[in-house]
Structure formats: C-alpha cells, structure tokens
C-alpha cells in the first residue's frame, strides 16, 4: 500500500510539474508571396503549369533556407482566384485572361499548401477583401466578373473598382468566399491585407449614399467605415 501511495504521489508531482511549465515561445517568421501583377509569383502570366510549379518551389526553398516558418500566399487579388474551388473567376495573373485557369490544370493553392507543409511551413491564405479591379482598362475584366454581374455592389475610385462593404449583401458575399476556402483547403490561417477602403485620393469616396442607407448608429462616416 505504501509503495502504491508513493507511486501515485510521484506521478501527481510529475504531472503538476509538466503543466506548470510554460510552453516555449514560437517565433512567427512569415513572408508574403504576392500574385497581383505577378509581383512575386508567377513571374508572368501565361507560363505553363510546370514552370509555375518550378518557380513556386524555388521561392519556397529560398524561404526555407532563410528560416521562414509561414507563407502568406495571395489567393484573391482582385475578386478573382488562385484556387480551383471558387465561384469567382480564375485570376488574370495566371494565364493573362481572367477566367482562364492553368494549363494543364492544377490547383495553385492546393499545390502551395502541400509544398509549404513538406518544408515544415504554414500556409496562410491572403485575401484582398474589397479591391475588385486593378486597372482602368475594362477590356482586362471578364464580362463574367462579379463587377459586371452585380454592378450595384461597387463604387469606382482612383481608376479602380471596390466592393462597397457598407452593403450587408457585400459583407455576406465576402464572408462566404473566405469560408469556402477555410472549409475546403488545409490552410493554417487567413489574412486580410491591402486595399480595404482605398487610399484617399483627390476625389470624394462615393459611398455616402450607402452611409445614409445603413448608418448602423454612426453619425461620422469615418467611424462608420472603420467599424
């Protein structure tokens, strides 16, 4: 009996000691891979799938050598997609034509996830939530793009089109787009970055009508936007 009591006491002491130890701090060493305008990857639109994969592998290898442990991968630069399981169109920056996917077919986000995880790195999906177009040249925007399907959801500012997040249906739509990725891909995080509301220009931002319709208790439009 005394041996059993001693064993239980020792086990309790060890367990308490383990739980009392604080978990070691983990340094987050993340790096962005921008796909918009082919800034980081792919180097240009229209590359074959094999060349796209080779380029991405080289980028990931470099970040692994530099001791990065997280990749923040831009998956939605302009209300379009760098992943297959999307109701939005393929990004212009893949093939040089919005709505046209990689040839031969593969899923860039799925490939990026697999390759990052092989290297012990997290893969975070980076969304540009409100920017819908990058260029004033409308010929680059597919007629099937959301800006043409739902024009009432957008305002034009500084030669670009933006979702109007003051509209409840816009917020619901963006939430749906992001949750689809969360549910269908083994990502390790979600990032909102770059182009929420546009940077201030000389012209007034044309969302005052939306503010009047949906003030949500705010009297100052700047506070309303921040909220």
Task: Identify the role of each PLM range.
Residues 64, 110-124:
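Surface-exposed amphipathic alpha-helices with a cationic face
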Residues 54-80, 184-187:
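Catalytic domains of carbohydrate-active enzymes, especially glycoside hydrolases
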Residues 42-49, 59, 98-102, 160-165, ...:
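Second-shell loop/turn segments in exported
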Residues 1-22:
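Bacterial Sec-dependent N-terminal signal peptides
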Residues 66-103:
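Aromatic-lined carbohydrate-binding/catalytic grooves of carbohydrate-active enzymes
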Residues 81-96, 131-158, 194-221:
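Aromatic- and acidic-residue-enriched segments that line the glycan-binding/catalytic groove
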Residues 26, 34, 38-54, 114, ...:
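Active-site-adjacent "subsite" loops/lids of carbohydrate-active enzymes
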């Amino acid at each position: 009996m005394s041996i059993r009591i001693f064993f239980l006491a020792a086990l309790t002491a060890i367990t308490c000691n383990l739980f009392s130890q604080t978990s070691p701090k983990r340094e987050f060493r993340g790096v962005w891979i921008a796909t918009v305008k082919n800034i980081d990857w792919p180097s240009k639109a229209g590359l074959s799938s094999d060349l796209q994969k080779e380029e991405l592998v080289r980028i990931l290898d470099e970040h692994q050598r530099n001791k990065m442990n997280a990749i923040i991968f831009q998956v939605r630069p302009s209300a379009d997609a760098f992943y297959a399981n999307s109701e939005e169109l393929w990004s212009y920056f893949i093939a040089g034509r919005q709505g046209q996917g990689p040839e031969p077919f593969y899923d860039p986000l799925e490939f990026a996830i697999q390759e990052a995880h092989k290297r012990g790195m997290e893969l975070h999906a980076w969304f540009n939530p409100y920017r819908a177009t990058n260029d004033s040249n409308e010929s680059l925007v597919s007629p099937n793009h959301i800006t043409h399907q739902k024009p009432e959801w957008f305002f034009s500012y500084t030669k670009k089109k933006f979702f109007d997040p003051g509209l409840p249906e816009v917020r619901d739509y963006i939430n749906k787009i992001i949750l689809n990725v969360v549910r269908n891909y083994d990502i390790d995080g979600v990032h909102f970055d770059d182009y929420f509301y546009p940077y201030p220009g000389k012209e007034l931002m044309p969302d005052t009508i939306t503010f009047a319709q949906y003030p949500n208790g705010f009297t100052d439009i700047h506070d309303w936007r921040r909220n």
